[in-house]
Amino acid sequence: MFLTKTLIRRSLSTFASSPSDSLLADKALTFLKRHPYQLHHLSANFTPEAASNLLLKSQNDQALILKFLNWANPHQFFTLRCKCITLHILTKFKLYKTAQILAEDVAAKTLDDEYASLVFKSLQETYDLCYSTSSVFDLVVKSYSRLSLIDKALSIVHLAQAHGFMPGVLSYNAVLDATIRSKRNISFAENVFKEMLESQVSPNVFTYNILIRGFCFAGNIDVALTLFDKMETKGCLPNVVTYNTLIDGYCKLRKIDDGFKLLRSMALKGLEPNLISYNVVINGLCREGRMKEVSFVLTEMNRRGYSLDEVTYNTLIKGYCKEGNFHQALVMHAEMLRHGLTPSVITYTSLIHSMCKAGNMNRAMEFLDQMRVRGLCPNERTYTTLVDGFSQKGYMNEAYRVLREMNDNGFSPSVVTYNALINGHCVTGKMEDAIAVLEDMKEKGLSPDVVSYSTVLSGFCRSYDVDEALRVKREMVEKGIKPDTITYSSLIQGFCEQRRTKEACDLYEEMLRVGLPPDEFTYTALINAYCMEGDLEKALQLHNEMVEKGVLPDVVTYSVLINGLNKQSRTREAKRLLLKLFYEESVPSDVTYHTLIENCSNIEFKSVVSLIKGFCMKGMMTEADQVFESMLGKNHKPDGTAYNIMIHGHCRAGDIRKAYTLYKEMVKSGFLLHTVTVIALVKALHKEGKVNELNSVIVHVLRSCELSEAEQAKVLVEINHREGNMDVVLDVLAEMAKDGFLPNGIS
């Protein structure tokens, strides 16, 4: 006790404090201990020297220091030196949270390197007075780093090292973390890490995790993996955070399978994936549209005892919305609410976007109301999504009502919002209103972009006013806005629709001259124009050109070409082209069979039959059924070929009931069964034990004389050979013999 008092007296002697300062300090101490409400009487005359005196006298009394800090902090006498003394004391007591707040207050006042040097000097001068440790420098460096004052943080590190102090791994980790968070160039972090090693500071698992996160964020997964491998050789075992960071890095690079492998390898290191691990993988799968695989991950999560949290549900809902699976998104939303979890603004915006995309604006508004009830504020994107949804349907009154609410809630419409309104007016054919919105944008200080002008231009093209569309193109060029591929494609399509193919071709040539690559819409418009003119050679030439240039034809392109070929009785070429939709890699993956089916009304009858055959060969009977039914809906009566293909397809797929139903329809319509179809149907019925149906088919075939004697014999032999059972055949033959219908070729 005597030694402590002696040291304090010695410390106080280093300050040039007057007796009056000492008296003030003693008086404040008395008030702090007994009458804290009297302290305000001292505030006006209290000096920085008195404050320093008080702090040093009471540096071993934690409660007293905290009381003084609470009183002194807002006052001017609590200077930088006083704050540095307080930081030393708080750190010594390990009151890191309170110390952090004070240190960040000091850091926030640092405007230049000179002040940072002053901070260090004050810490250095008061260091011995408080018997401090180097951890105080770690604390200050961390505070500068948390405020993203990275250069100032490093200057404190360098000053400390130059004066014999040893900032440790915490200081370097703080600087590295701030560097990554501020998205500074990753090379800066590499240099800091190199400096850290040169300073003999050993990295820990947090250091490596920070660096791995930085390299993953920069898209340099290879360097991140090198660090991952180096960790263990340096005695740092990767933890779950390390793995999660790398898995996320893989997912962001669309290397989800590599991410999965890493997830599986965690068990080899004795680590178990946590909820974040699974959420990262689910997010990667959702972004890639691999929603079927998500169910396997969810099953594994459930097996390991993890419940879905808000992040999981929000990710799943967004993923299902992106996929267009609105039903499953709504199921997830309902399940989320049942578990007492709150969807985020992003989740609701995704649901609203999905409903708008589906044209269900009533449901979209219901979700907006739900947001309000749950205390969530729609953001600019939410409102813009609704404005776009109403505009797409031409409900402009509702779109403007949402716009007013958007303004009332403090959100200024963006260029994207105005573009949605412009599009709405173009959809409804009110081009004057579209131009008015364009002018309104300019008045509000927003510059129309290429989308704004292209939308107006496209609107004029749809209104068959291509000359006005050309004027808009000239205006945008004068304003310094370069037309893009969409601009030219809209104009080309507009001219093609008016049979002004020469001008469309001139625009195409101009497009190439300015270095804009044509897309599938550009090519399809021109191909359609040539097909309409009967110039199939030029149309096919353009088709070949687009494939050579890596522009993948879509289903509309193929529909146009197939129709053109069929109209000129070039059926074989039409069929060959149609088969590309099934077997050639040059066909884009986003040409969905659903889209193809929807375009059946635009494809000639013979090609539709080929389409059915393609689906049956692939075992895609649901799609084949849809095409078959679409034929009936379009007054295209299926012929015998279509029925034979469908019956055979369903037999192969194992749907005997459907095959037999089609067989009865076919017989009723008077079409002939092919030998292969009969054999397939008989085999399938026999396999399923459908004796009555089997008898019916055989009797019909043999009595109808649809097949030749050789074909009839082939059917019967096939049954015996394949099934090893002649009982049914003999029964049928006996019945036919009675009626005099025994085939001549069978004895």
Curated annotation (Swiss-Prot):
Recorded GO CC terms: mitochondrion
Alphabetic keyword roster: Repeat
PPR repeat coordinates: 133-167, 168-203, 204-238, 239-273, 274-308, 309-343, 344-378, 379-413, 414-448, 449-483, 484-518, 519-553, 554-588, 604-638, 639-673
PROSITE patterns membership: PPR
Xref: Gene3D superfamilies: Tetratricopeptide repeat domain
One Pfam entry name: PPR_2
Family: Belongs to the PPR family. P subfamily.
Name of the molecule in the record: Pentatricopeptide repeat-containing protein At5g39710
Species of the source: Arabidopsis thaliana (Mouse-ear cress)
